[in-house]
């Protein structure tokens, strides 16, 4: 069983906040997979760190992109959010709890339960709420766990990005998978302030809490054992590191600067551009992008 500590985050228009989140956890792990959704600005220096695999994508799957590398990973898989600060013992604590339960449960610090189904609102109908920012006095099993503070071993849970059929509801899809596969999600005891919040202008909760019809319909289907609603996809699953399928996400001016040695070239690492294999950095990705841009 692999002991590799793999941290994963998908970020959308929160570069400054993302940097703070990464700074809080980078010394606690072996690998960090970072997806920048619809990013066309500067690349901060921390994303050239040897531990970081940087990927560019559109935003068609939103927060689900933190699970993009799951089916290619072996070890303890931790998913984080770009608006949270993690304590120095966070990874150690989460992995210790996984081991305490024999790596048979998904661990989280955030979750919700519903007393019965059908519910009228995924965001507003919960009868029990456990927040990562507040104290949770004892371990409790939850129906839906927060993926911003989640940890499990890949021997327990491994699925492809196709499983996430709609964006910005990763908590719901993981809840579905765990129910179908009889995996308990355990929201762990922790004190208030263990996780700290970086204030944001907008959040997924702000965007979705008053428009959660799809989340509600899916949650009801899961727990009433009914077919899932038909979910149309206007786009293919986003593919990272390949220009021909994500042309709108590339800032060519910035890539030109990098390619011409104006920005952090010495801090890049080799990238595997085969999407079916695990990326390992940034340098070859930039070179391939520039090659295609120049018609090579």
Predicted regions and their residues:
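Short loop->beta transition adjacent to catalytic acidic/histidine clusters or analogous donor-positioning motifs
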Residues: 3-5, 25-34, 52, 75
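Short, well-formed alpha-helical segments that are part of the catalytic scaffolds
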Residues: 11-27
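A short acidic, amphipathic alpha-helical/loop segment
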Residues: 20-24, 66-69, 92-94
């Amino acid at each position: 069983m692999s002991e590799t500590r793999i941290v994963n985050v998908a970020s959308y228009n929160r570069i400054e906040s993302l940097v703070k989140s990464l700074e809080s956890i980078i010394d606690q792990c072996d690998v960090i997979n970072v997806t920048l959704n619809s990013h066309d600005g500067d690349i901060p220096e921390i994303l050239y760190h040897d531990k970081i695999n940087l990927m560019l994508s559109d935003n068609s799957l939103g927060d689900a992109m933190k699970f993009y590398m799951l089916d290619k990973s072996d070890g303890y898989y931790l998913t984080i959010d770009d608006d949270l600060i993690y304590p120095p013992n966070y990874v150690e604590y989460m992995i210790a709890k996984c081991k305490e339960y024999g790596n048979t449960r998904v661990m989280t610090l955030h979750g919700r339960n519903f007393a019965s189904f059908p519910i009228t609102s995924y965001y507003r109908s919960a009868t029990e709420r456990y927040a990562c920012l507040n104290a949770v006095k004892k371990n409790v099993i939850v129906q839906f766990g927060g993926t911003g503070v989640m940890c499990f071993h890949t021997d327990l849970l491994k699925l492809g990005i196709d499983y996430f059929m709609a964006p910005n509801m990763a908590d719901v899809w993981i809840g579905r998978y765990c129910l179908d596969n009889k995996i308990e999600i355990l929201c762990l005891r922790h004190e208030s302030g263990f996780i700290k919040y970086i204030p944001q202008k907008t959040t997924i909760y702000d965007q979705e809490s008053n428009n959660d019809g799809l989340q509600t319909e899916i949650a009801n289907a899961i727990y009433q054992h009914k077919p899932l609603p038909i979910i149309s996809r206007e786009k293919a699953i986003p593919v990272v590191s390949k220009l021909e399928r994500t042309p709108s996400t590339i800032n060519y001016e910035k890539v030109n600067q990098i390619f011409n040695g104006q920005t952090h070239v010495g801090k890049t690492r080799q990238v595997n551009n085969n999407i079916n294999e695990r990326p390992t950095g940034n340098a070859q990705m930039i070179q391939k992008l520039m090659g295609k841009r120049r018609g090579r």
